Amino acid sequence: MTPEELKAMNKAVKKAKRIATEKAGELHDLVEDRLPAAYEEIPAIAQATYDACKAWAEADAAYKAAEAAN
């Protein structure tokens, strides 16, 4: 893998982490500010947070594996 490809992967990992952090913040805000009235929002926000965190974890693992292979 070229240094440019590794750099692009690292950038993707950072973007995925930022998105996961934003989703976690949305979940936190729901818990802190809008529950119990907005309880119906829990499944959608929780799923979006889970998906974003999983995407980050997969991107991070792929980047680390590619980095170790070089």
Language model segments and positions:
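Short, charge-rich amphipathic interface segments used for partner binding and complex assembly
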Residues: 29-68
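Short intrinsically disordered terminal tails
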Residues: 1-2, 66-70
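N-terminal acidic leader/helix
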Residues: 1-31, 61
